[in-house]
Amino acid sequence: METKLVRIAEISATTKHPIFTSVYHLINEDMSKQCHKELDGSKAVGIDKVTKDEYGKNLDRNIKDLVQRLKNKSFKPLPSLRVYIPKANGKKRPLGIASYEDKIVQMAVKKILGAIYEPRFLNCMYGFRPNRGCHEAIKEIYQRISYGKISYIVDADIKGFFDHIDHEWMMKFLEWNIQDKNLLWLIRKYLKAGIMEQGKFEPTEEGSAQGSVMSPMLANIYMHHVLTLWFKLVVKKEMQGECFLVNFADDFVAGFQYKSEAERYYKELKERMEKFGLELESSKSRLIEFGRFAEQNRRARGEHKPETFDFLGFTFYCSKNRKGGFVPKVQTSRKKFEQKVRAYKNWIYDNRNRPMREIIKELNVKLIGHYRYYGVTWNFRKITTFLHRVQQFLFKAMNRRGCRRAYTWNGFVEMLKYYPLAKPKTYYCLY
């Protein structure tokens, strides 16, 4: 099966306009069992309440029945279960949890779409892709600004992107490279499967349920056609100066050499989004002066130091190296820093009555995860400050375990010698 997917990827990579007419049959028993094997059994269950272990008890029979229903097209996806998770701004993000059998089918579709589209996605796309991620996106922006002539940044975010993907446009984009009617039928079935919230069914006329197995791939295909291809084939050709685009899911940053071209792009971007049923989040989208000459230009106009912009939890700001030369640096964004601090504080207080050895062990796992993401060049001071805040919360929490004070500060420091907290470390170099 993997050999066939590799062959599809080769055709997609070497053909100018590949069209795939027969790929639906790849969703057979072998692929379905492989998808079952790869799925994380600890994830939340859908409306059917079926877990991976329960489905696997009669795996051969279940898979055979599933594939037969796919073949005769009697298969019908179940609605996704709507749940909410908190966002940094205090609001809640809706997620759609598919039933277990739907997760299997969605992963199979994702594999096929991945073989077709991964070779065709542009290098400026970093979200939900193999061997690419947040750090690579941050590094790309750093290098473009450091070594190029970029002087203006358009930082944009799409309002409710996953909830407003237009189904008809989505299908048109897919039909550009896929003319297998059966696969298109299945994808449309999922787009229209609906959601179940508090026992009430709601149809889905637009959007792709965030949290589903297939949703990130569909989102990338949508952004590929709406944004990145447009930037490459239209925007770049109209520009006289340097420009670049870095995209991660619904978040993206564009850089320009000239202000007039940045303003032109920003205006056309809004119109482009509206054409495909999308809207920029006004509070998170803006054009700023940022780059090698931003500070001296603003000083000459009697203005304050250059503005900053946030991307993927980091704040970019104009700075200097040891020789006095320009360098764009990054640090944990204030919003993400405070969000993480609150989360750690709540966890520490909720777990303060557990044995110290257990608390430190689990806390270190969390801290190392924090360092692995935020431990990038120039951000060591910020992650060190984060550790100090965590230590303070831990000290206060330990002294609330009983009526009497459990530790003096010196005693607490001595205790940390026996149960040390993980030390900050820079894991990722941006240059």
Put a short name on every predicted segment:
Residues 33-92:
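Phosphate/adenylate-binding "loop-and-lid" substructures adjacent to NTP/NAD/dNTP-binding pockets
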Residues 380-431:
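A terminal-accessory region detector
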Residues 244-248, 285-293, 363-366, 383-391, ...:
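A glycine-rich phosphate-binding loop feature that marks nucleotide/adenosyl-phosphate handling sites
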Residues 1-23, 30:
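Charged, compositionally biased N-terminal leader segments and the immediate start
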Residues 192, 280-355:
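A conserved non-catalytic segment of reverse transcriptases
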Residues 27-33, 79-81, 88, 191, ...:
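Core structural elements
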Residues 125, 203-208, 327-329, 345-359, ...:
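Short, solvent-exposed helix-loop connector elements
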Residues 69-84, 88, 120-290:
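Conserved polymerase palm-domain catalytic core
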